[in-house]
Amino acid sequence: MALQRLGYLGFDLKKTFIQKGAEFIFSQQQEDGSWLMPGKNQLVDEEKGYQMMPIQTAIPLLGLVMCGYGEDKRAEQAYKWLISKLLDDGAWPVDIASGNYGGIAGYRRLAHSRWGCRSNTTAVLTCLAYHPKRRISEEAKRALDLILGTDMKLRTNLGFLIARLIGLEKSIGRITYMAKFDIGHILNLCWRVEASVKDSRIAEFVEFIKSEQGPYGLWEYINHPQATRWLTFDLLRSLFKLETQEDWISLELRTPFRSYPKKIKRF
């Protein structure tokens, strides 16, 4: 998280303290490109028994790529490990336990994926979106297409990830690290992946954002108002960038989204 924060603030691999932090993280990397899961005593009940979680590698990789290490051969190895865990439908699973994919809680569902986890998929997509070349890869575009199917407009979550980056929100959780659906972050991903407001889902998110702008031109982060100027800068940048994007094709049909759909009973 420290490298993510420093990278967001504009520090890169030219700084000695960034180099030292990055080398320490790389020193913990496994031969296959991944990073180990925490010890069992650090896992919550929901995570015990898991053998692999994409987010275990996405979190350290994101800090590295935000500081300019995206094309480092060690980072590229981590990307290859993440791509190898990609599901056929373009999402990433929550985990593998005893050779089987883990179940998906409703708050982490993806509308058009059976085993895809929105938190894990968002984490990996964020890593791809900050990479100078992989950000417009088919894997990134497909993942964003799936995430856009989460049709939720939650005002209370708007700005959460920015507030976490600047230290106002706690950095906790593994499976839930990217579980909050923050439209501000989604728009940030959209322009980085070069999506377009011609997609009706993105257009609706943009309209929602504009409707929440305050009387003085600012977007307030409700939980911590001191993050307001940071959130405002981020949203203005995303809105400006999205106005120039046109080359985007969605492959997903638009369907109503429900976190916990009603199950059809047999009897």
List each language-model region with its residue ranges.
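Short acidic, low-complexity segments enriched in Ser/Thr/Gly/Pro
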Residues: Q29-W35
